[in-house]
Amino acid sequence: MDNIPIIIKRRLQAEVMGPVFDEMSAQLGQEKAEDILRVAIQNAAIAEGQNFAATHSSPGQSPLRNFIDLFEQWKAGGALEVDVLHESDDQFDFNVTRCRYAEMYQEMDLGHIGHLLSCHRDGTFCQGFDDRITLQRDQTIMGGASCCTFRYRCET
């Protein structure tokens, strides 16, 4: 599945998870359904990060540099428009100015869980990829802001 753009993977996942979430909400309540989805997505993102680290890391590069090299996959097909503010072996700062993931979830009537399906993955993916990488993000387009602020740091 490496050759499938990530935005297509997320659409396919959302087509399944949307109805599952609706049923969980009906039977368990919205809050419990969100908790279950949050934990499931977090675990999937950590596992995905571990897989990417095992298959896409170059020896001799910093963990964050390996991560930066992968970032193109999330942007594939115009999925994200970004302004890179700083890029180094221990810091990667950028703003997302257009997010087709957010647009896609809105079009699918899943905007209410889009943050769980995509945004929540970003920081937890790092835990699996290399736990020295951390993300600080103060705002997201999915949350109503004009841009998403990504501030990655890596302990060396």
Regions found by a protein language model. Give the residues of each.
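A helicase ATPase "motif cassette" and its flanking acidic/Ser/Thr-rich regulatory loops
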Residues: 94
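N-terminal accessory segment detector
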Residues: 1-91, 100-118, 123, 132-147, ...
